[in-house]
Amino acid sequence: MKFTLSWLKDHLETEAPLDEIVTALTDLGHEVEGVEDPVKVLGAFRICRVIEAQPHPNADRLRLCRVATWPNGPDAPSEEVQVVCGAPNARTGLVGVFAPVGTHVPGTGVDLKPGVIRGVESNGMLCSERELMLSDDHDGIIDLPEDAPMGMRFIDYKGVNDPTIEVKITPNRPDGLGVRGLARDLAARGLGRLKPLPVEPVPGLFPSPVSVTIEAALKEKGCPLFAGRTIRGVKNGPSPDWLQARLRSVGLRPISALVDITNYFTIGLNRPLHVFDVAKITGGLRIHAAEGGEELLALDGKTYKLRPGQMLISDDAQPESLAGIMGGELSGCTEETTDVFLESAYWDPITIAATGRALKIVSDARYRFERGVDPAFTLPGLELATRMILDLCGGEASEVVMDGAVPDTSRAYRFDPKRVVSLVGMEIPEAEQRTTLEALGFTLEGELAAPPSWRPDVQGEADLVEEIARVASLTKLQGKPLPRAQAGVPKPILTPLQVREQAARRTLAALGYNECVTYSFIDEAAAKLFGGGSEAVRVENPISSEMTHLRPDLLPGLLRAAARNQARGFADMALCEIGPVFAGGEPGEQQLQATGLLVGASAPRDPFGSRRPVDVYDAKADAEAVLAAVGAPAKMQISRKVPGWWHPGRSGAVGLGPNLLATFGEVHPKILREMDVKGPAVAFTILVANVPLPKVKTPTRPALKLSDLQAVERDFAFVVDASVEALTLVNAAQGADKALIESVRVFDQFSGDKAEAQMGAGKKSLALTVRLQPTDRTLTDKDIEAVSAKIVEKVAKATGATLRG
């Protein structure tokens, strides 16, 4: 958005210099993209008088001029300089414009230096308008009236000394699309006083011959308010010079007084208006939704075909305007126009944005309406524009006609001065906070603050804090050191869950896994394969059909990654991921999971034959390593109760009582086929948050106690039912004497037809190694036999096992 400094000062009473205003605008959130200051470009060019002009002694087309200049202004003494000039109108007594040595001439891009032209010294330059980039006239040097004040800056005499400021307005600040909105922010900052904007209703002298109606369905969403009035007897000639100059300065082409006035209000007060030629309207105006197929020749000379639902302004005969976007050519005003209908309406931002985007029309009106103009200024803007038309174009106004009502945008939020410190960290006195909000147009009543109608972006208490901090300047926010603990060790920065997550990630990396980061969204079919896919985790507005549900497990994403790698020739891989999984949409139904996936072989090919397919024991070992890293206790139970996506008989679950900690095993072949993964593939999943925290926290780790006495190992072979799990035997043997037994491990299993032939149908043999570690004395044979008897007794009681003969 562009505006001039004088335009800003129409609304802001200030003595602040331009640089301070520009800096303040950027600091307030309105980024200044550029400043065109004529003073910096043309400030050195001053009015002068040619005392004498004689022919150049060495050139027929050049003139040798003695010029009286006032380099220090009209009140300072004059200086005489010699200038060689080639303009045909250079003559004695001419009043022109002089550029001294050292001046940059914008029209030529040259910095003036003392020179010698055809053997004669020349100091400075007599300028044409093209050399000053004021016009394309280069027939001669500037020729001013005799009464032009000597020594005055030419830009002041010409009236082209008004700086132009271009500001980038963010989409959330539609009030900044008017000069008055920017002036209000600057006044709140303290750079001046916002001038009042009195609105005096213009009395209606006759009923308006043009009526207005809004289609009932559009009053709720589309056009809540449409107002206007007829002004008859106007003279639609060129607008005044000051208005034309102001519009040109912001890049708008003056057209006629009526059109220029509407553009003036659009830029100055953020109030888009439109004028219809009454003579070209049949009956009244109707705001309605297009049925589809209607065509309108717009003011840009293009014909637009409307779709069903897009808003139109039509008379009794045909469409006349694209509502809130652009007027129609057929009802446009010309120099012959004498009676006009002035429109001021409030249009729904979403509807205007959708129509403008569909028709690919960009206009100043659309740009403002789709961001949200002030609905409460609809009628005051109509009155102010009416007064200006009467002043510049004459005529008389009718009574105001309208349909609809001003939308109720009133709302209030709690105003707590302490929130500025807690949210922003700035200490601003309460009185200053209240003054700031009131200067911005907020209404304060007790602990409530009501935003003005022109601020649709303010939607909560945090926005009040933002306004206060913005006006006070966030550049004043100073860094403060973090508070130090008064005594003792400071609290850890990371939570226990974050510490465990880091430990799991480091352990997986040490085990050789490559970490993946997959989407939290998967398709419904994949979600159902892993126990998900319910409506509770369906994404309302998915990115694509492959991301419709929140993932119930990390395995689908890792399997998809494995399939993509296999398709590119990578058969062996170790992938892992740590992230959230979702069982439902309620609080507490989200968990942190650490998952590893092994596919293919355990090692590269080598001459020693160590390469083998990955198996369930690889997954189990890695799962135990990660569990140990996150603090899981050594004694955990392993069961076969695993979900259906694991291979039955080649998988297991790790838990503490009813608390599930992890699952591991081969991925079910059906799942591999569905996910397009070529096996073998084993995996494990760990629910990190389910691992219990230590009950007792010690300041330091206790010293490791090692016995000086020699350990003793004894082997036991038990005959058990084929259904008995090895872990049951291990746990039973471990519990025989917890003080002496250091470890129990399975070292052999004998099963199958040969085993049953020796031991009976449905039987197998499991062999255990039990390590006994004394701490106070060396074990005797009697001690060892006693412990062995306990082990046999415990195992027999737990499993019905007998010692193998």
Swiss-Prot record:
SUPFAM superfamilies: Anticodon-binding domain of PheRS, Class II aaRS and biotin synthetases, Nucleic acid-binding proteins, PheT/TilS domain, Putative DNA-binding domain. Keywords: Aminoacyl-tRNA synthetase, ATP-binding, Cytoplasm, Ligase, Magnesium, Metal-binding, Nucleotide-binding, Protein biosynthesis, RNA-binding, tRNA-binding. It comes from the Bacteria. Mg(2+) binds at D457, D463, E466, E467. Its cofactor is Mg(2+). Residues 707-804 form the FDX-ACB domain. It is an enzyme of class 6 (ligase). It catalyses: tRNA(Phe) + L-phenylalanine + ATP = L-phenylalanyl-tRNA(Phe) + AMP + diphosphate + H(+). The keyword Signal does not apply. Binds 2 magnesium ions per tetramer. Its EC number is 6.1.1.20. CDD domains: PheRS_beta_core (cd00769), tRNA_bind_bactPheRS (cd02796). It holds the Pfam family FDX-ACB. It is found in: Cytoplasm. One of its GO terms (molecular function) is magnesium ion binding. Residues 39-155 form the tRNA-binding domain. NCBIfam families: pheT_bact (TIGR00472). Belongs to the phenylalanyl-tRNA synthetase beta subunit family. Type 1 subfamily. This is Phenylalanine--tRNA ligase beta subunit.
